[in-house]
Amino acid sequence: TYNLKKIHTGIIFQTIIGILVIALLVLGYTFILQRNYNNSALDESVARNKQCADAIHKHMSDKFVREDFDSISSIDDIGLPRYKKLQKQLNELRALNSTRYLYTVKKTDDGKLIYLVDGLDLDADDYAYPGTLIEKEMVTYIEQALSGKVVYSNKIVDTTWGHIFTACYPVEASDGTGDIIGALCMEMDMESTYACMEADNHRAFMISIIAIVVFAILANIVYIYLRKQKYIKIQQREELEKAVSA
């Protein structure tokens, strides 16, 4: 009886350890595969958006003058001919490239970042009038652009208005001074990419759980089989010992 209990405990311990090891291996392998797949999908989406953003910037880079950033600062300026012209250009370009948002930005004398020309339709619910404060999620990217750097978000940016890719470009004055007079920014929708990645993560998690359950069932079957074999061997040995002692 003592031997049976000892063997029984040993088999249980080995089975539990085996299940844990297999579970960790399955989870680890699934995590690595899923991470690599997600990174690949994200890199492809970001590269595609970068290419689109660069094309927009190339088209617009030589169309700005200092006046576009100095003379526009409030809602009162939407009637200016220059504002109307730029707004029309950005609106057409945004629609052509399926870009979600396309706009110009500047920093005011008191250090605030504000919208200037928004490329959305004028009757859009989220159209930003000149002078509207920039959302905090975009501040870091715009600040870098205003320092002279071209900035891309190399990941999905989670904002209050959705999951996006953003690119910001410094706008230099065309008068030869080299002054950074503002920034041209654009945002591409990443909602579909984010949804696919989340769905894939959930699917991978469920597959891992199913695999672990299957391994646990198989391990239990093996445990029962081994326990039975051990019991048979002990019974045979005890019968042999009895026969010898008789």
What are these regions (language model features)?
Residues T1-L20, Q229-A243:
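Positive-inside N-terminal membrane-insertion signal
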Residues K5-N36, I209-N220:
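Extreme N-terminal signal-anchor transmembrane helix of membrane signaling/transducer proteins, especially
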Residues I32-S71, M188:
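Membrane-proximal extracytoplasmic alpha-helices
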Residues N91-L113, I207:
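Short N-terminal helix-loop-first-beta-strand/juxtamembrane motif that initiates sensory/input modules
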Residues G119-V157:
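Extracytoplasmic/periplasmic sensor domains and loops in membrane signaling proteins
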Residues V151, W161-P170:
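A short beta-strand signature within small-molecule sensing/ligand-binding domains used
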Residues W161, E172-S174, C185-H202:
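Helix-start (N-cap) segments at beta->loop->alpha junctions
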Residues C196-Y231:
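Cytoplasm-proximal transmembrane signaling helix
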